[in-house]
Amino acid sequence: VALGYVGVLTMRLEMPWVGNLKEKRALVRPVVERLKVRFPLTVARLDGLDAHDWEVIGVATISNDYGWVKETLKMAADYVASEGPYRVTSEETEITMIGEGDLDEDELED
C-alpha cells in the first residue's frame, strides 16, 4: 500500500510573436503566481528562461489520494491552457507512488 503519491506536470508554452524576455515574463509570471494561489501546488519556471518565445513550467503536488493528485494536476493544466495568449505545445503528467504503509483492517475491507 502506498503512503502517498507525488504528481508532476510539465507544460511547454510557446509565444512566437513575443519579441523580448520582458514581454514573455509579463505573460508567464502572472499565470505561475495565480497557479500558486489557486491550487495546492509548487510551481516553477523550468526551462527556456533565456528564450524570448517559449518556456517550460512545472507543477508538483503530493497527497495520499491518487485520484486527488490526478484531478488537481488536470485542473492546473486546464487552467494554464485557458489563461494565457500563449500556446501549450506539450504537456506531460507523471504520478509516482511513494513509500509503503501498513495495511489496517479498514483498508482490507475496501
Predicted regions and their residues:
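A short linear hydrophobic-aromatic micro-motif
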Residues: P40-D47, S90
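Short, charge-patterned binding micro-sites
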Residues: A44-N64
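Short, highly charged C-terminal tails/helix-capping segments
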Residues: L49-W54, T93-E107
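SAM-dependent methyltransferases
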Residues: A2, L108-D110
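C-terminal structural segments of small proteins and small subunits
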Residues: D65-D102
